């Protein structure tokens, strides 16, 4: 009887440990995706000169490494902002 209770206790501990590790993996993945997202936004602004602004986020963008540039709203860690985004 004691050995059965001990075995059940060990199984319960293993199950609890496995589920908590999986939860930690999910949180780590969310953090990594978030940092990749902000890194990509920061990369959009490199090499660009801009006069973007106003309530409709209008203006001009000139980028040294791309001919396809435009003003658009971006999400930054501090909130929303109008900026220059280049592709290509």
From Swiss-Prot:
Keywords: Amidation, Bromination, Disulfide bond, Hydroxylation, Ion channel impairing toxin, Neurotoxin, Secreted, Signal, Toxin. Residues 21-46 form a propeptide. One of its GO terms (cellular component) is extracellular region. The keyword NADP does not apply. Residues 1-20 form the signal peptide. The modification 6'-bromotryptophan is found at residue 80. Expressed by the venom duct. Transmembrane segments: none annotated. It comes from the Eukaryota. It is found in: Secreted. The modification Serine amide is found at residue 87. The keyword Translocase does not apply. GO terms for molecular function: ion channel regulator activity; toxin activity. Contains 5 disulfide bonds. The modification 4-hydroxyproline is found at residue 55. The cysteine framework is VIII (C-C-C-C-C-C-C-C-C-C). Sigma-conotoxins bind and inhibit serotonin-gated ion channels. This peptide selectively and reversibly inhibits 5-hydroxytryptamine 3 receptor (HTR3A) through competitive antagonism (IC(50)=53-86.8 nM). Belongs to the conotoxin S superfamily. This is Sigma-conotoxin GVIIIA. It comes from Conus geographus.
């Amino acid at each position: 009887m004691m050995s059965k209770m001990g075995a059940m206790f060990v199984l319960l501990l293993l199950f609890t440990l496995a589920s908590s590790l999986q939860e930690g993996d999910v949180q780590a993945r969310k953090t990594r995706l978030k940092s990749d997202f902000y890194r990509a936004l920061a990369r959009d602004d490199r090499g660009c000169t801009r006069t973007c602004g106003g309530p409709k986020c209008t203006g001009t963008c000139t980028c040294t490494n791309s001919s396809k540039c435009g003003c658009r709203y971006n999400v930054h860690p501090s909130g929303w902002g109008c900026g220059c985004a280049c592709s290509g």
